[in-house]
């Protein structure tokens, strides 16, 4: 029996949940039929438990809707479908004891000694919230059981949300538990630079031996490998060697692995072998906690109402939040004035003005209305003519894409529409982008306008 019902179920779940939730928990699931039982396969126990707790009842409901009596039972367990054998022959690394003639000595050996870890980035200084709870929990599991818990661990999310902090925290924890461990943190561009240097100095075997001898390899911004075929080839073999030796790999990216254009499919597939978790923009309470925690680290007493004021106005990411706090502390230090809401408003005048221009549902509605030459009131109305329905659907889809609002909240902003109306709008926009080149161009133009 086919798994068509599961594919239909996935299509609806993708519309109902955020991209981060869908990509982290639902997209990695594989399905197969055993007589009249649908079996979902998850990459590890962590995913199994989370799906059971948060998504399973909805999955059962949708499967019953799409399959009728064809599927009698649904279960989820750890496992994976068989994967094709690697089609790349194993590499032979020439060692110093080889009978092959020695190459000329490198002009200058690459410095591999430092772990490049920032000792300030530890789990204790990472403020936990709903937006990063899962990523932090998974990171702590990896730190406690490197090479065993989730391998590789792939953390993705926007700029300044704490991915690098978690990566350093894992590395520091591994070294604390085992000072003899060989741990290396680096940006993906450093890996490329090391490889190029090794090629230039005829020391590629030394490069391979070093990277494949690590106990933990932590690579930041893996998306920069995109389009670099030789680097991807070398990393592919390094990845395989480390996993075969049960050594830990931790990767970060600004997007879900399957969405990294220019990355080989075999690499993207391997990125999903362990656990993929998202770090989302922090909610208000977490932003307040971050500000108070950072102020305490600087021996500054930050009034709660001031922290709340800053957190409410600066919503994009942790990095900008910390930057704003540093500016406030510096201004207070140089002027000798107490930190009050009025003082903060003056110290952050330009930054707050910029934040006020960030995308909101109201901004989206206004921009879409102007683009299509209709009134905002039309978008909020119940009118169903195509000239109004299309812009309304576009505005709803853009609101889901560009804001952190839930589907019910988006519906409320459009004249109290039901969340199912928003789901339908998002699905319709996705179809039109594929089938209508003019509509697709409109979507690109509006995304560019709203993102600039």
Curated annotation (Swiss-Prot):
Region of interest: Domain II: 85-115
UniProt GO molecular function: ATP binding; ATP hydrolysis activity; DNA replication origin binding; lipid binding
Ranges for region Domain III, AAA+ region: 116-332
Keywords in alphabetical order: ATP-binding, Cytoplasm, DNA replication, DNA-binding, Lipid-binding, Nucleotide-binding
Region ranges (Domain IV, binds dsDNA): 333-452
Entries under InterPro entries matching the protein: AAA+_ATPase (IPR003593), Chromosome_initiator_DnaA (IPR001957), Chromosome_initiator_DnaA-like (IPR020591), Chromosome_initiator_DnaA_CS (IPR018312), DnaA_C (IPR013159), DnaA_dom (IPR013317), DnaA_N_dom (IPR024633), DnaA_N_sf (IPR038454)
Subcellular location: Cytoplasm
Binding site for ATP: 160, 162-164
Record's keyword annotation contains Nucleotide-binding: yes
A biological process term (GO) from this entry: regulation of DNA replication
Domain I, interacts with DnaA modulators as annotated region, ranges: 1-85
Signal peptide: none
UniProt keyword annotation of Lipid biosynthesis present: no
GO cellular component terms, A-Z: cytoplasm; plasma membrane
Annotated function: Plays an essential role in the initiation and regulation of chromosomal replication. ATP-DnaA binds to the origin of replication (oriC) to initiate formation of the DNA replication initiation complex once per cell cycle. Binds the DnaA box (a 9 base pair repeat at the origin) and separates the double-stranded (ds)DNA. Forms a right-handed helical filament on oriC DNA; dsDNA binds to the exterior of the filament while single-stranded (ss)DNA is stabiized in the filament's interior.
The record's note on its domains: Domain I is involved in oligomerization and binding regulators, domain II is flexibile and of varying length in different bacteria, domain III forms the AAA+ region, while domain IV binds dsDNA.
Family: Belongs to the DnaA family.
Quaternary structure and partners: Oligomerizes as a right-handed, spiral filament on DNA at oriC.
Family matches, as NCBIfam families: DnaA
Protein name: Chromosomal replication initiator protein DnaA
Taxonomic source organism: Legionella pneumophila subsp. pneumophila (strain Philadelphia 1 / ATCC 33152 / DSM 7513)
């Amino acid at each position: 029996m086919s798994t068509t019902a599961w594919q239909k179920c996935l299509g609806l779940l993708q519309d109902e949940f955020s991209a981060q939730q869908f990509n982290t928990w639902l997209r990695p699931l594989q399905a197969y039929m055993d007589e009249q039982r649908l079996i979902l396969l998850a990459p590890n126990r962590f995913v199994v438990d989370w799906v059971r707790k948060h998504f399973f009842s909805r999955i059962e409901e949708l499967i019953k809707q799409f399959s009728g009596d064809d599927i009698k039972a649904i279960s989820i367990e750890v496992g994976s479908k068989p994967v094709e054998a690697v089609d790349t022959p194993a590499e032979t690394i020439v060692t110093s004891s080889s009978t092959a003639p020695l190459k000329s000595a490198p002009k200058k050996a690459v410095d591999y000694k430092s772990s490049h870890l920032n000792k300030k980035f530890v789990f204790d200084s990472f403020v936990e919230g709903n937006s990063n709870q899962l990523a932090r929990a998974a990171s702590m599991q990896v730190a406690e059981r490197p090479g065993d818990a989730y391998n590789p661990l792939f953390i993705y999310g926007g700029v300044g949300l704490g991915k690098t902090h978690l990566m350093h925290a894992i590395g520091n924890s591994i070294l604390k538990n085992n000072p003899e461990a060989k741990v290396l943190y680096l940006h993906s561009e450093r890996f490329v630079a090391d490889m190029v240097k090794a090629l230039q100095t005829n020391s590629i075997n030394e490069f391979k031996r070093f990277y494949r001898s690590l106990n933990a390899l932590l690579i930041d911004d893996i998306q920069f490998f995109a389009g670099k075929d030789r680097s991807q080839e070398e990393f592919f073999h390094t990845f395989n060697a480390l996993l075969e030796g049960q050594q830990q790999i931790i990767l970060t990216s600004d997007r879900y692995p399957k969405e990294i254009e220019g990355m080989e499919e075999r690499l993207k597939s391997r990125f999903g072998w362990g656990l993929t978790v998202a770090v989302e923009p922090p909610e208000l309470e977490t932003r307040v906690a971050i500000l108070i925690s950072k102020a305490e680290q600087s021996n500054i007493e930050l009034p709660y109402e001031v922290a709340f004021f800053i957190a409410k106005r600066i919503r994009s990411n942790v990095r900008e939040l910390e930057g704003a706090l540093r500016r406030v502390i510096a201004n207070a230090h140089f002027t000798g004035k107490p930190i009050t809401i009025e003082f903060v408003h003056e110290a952050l005048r330009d930054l707050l003005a910029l934040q006020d221009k960030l995308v909101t549902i109201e901004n989206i509605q206004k921009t879409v209305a102007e683009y299509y030459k209709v009134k905002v009131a039309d978008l909020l109305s119940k009118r169903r003519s195509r000239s109004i329905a299309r812009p309304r659907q576009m505005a709803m889809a853009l609101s889901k894409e560009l804001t952190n609002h839930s589907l019910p909240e988006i519906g409320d902003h459009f004249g109290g529409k039901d969340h199912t109306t928003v789901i339908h709008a998002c699905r319709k926009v996705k179809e039109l982008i594929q089938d209508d080149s003019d509509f697709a161009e409109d979507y690109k133009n509006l995304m560019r306008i709203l993102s600039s």
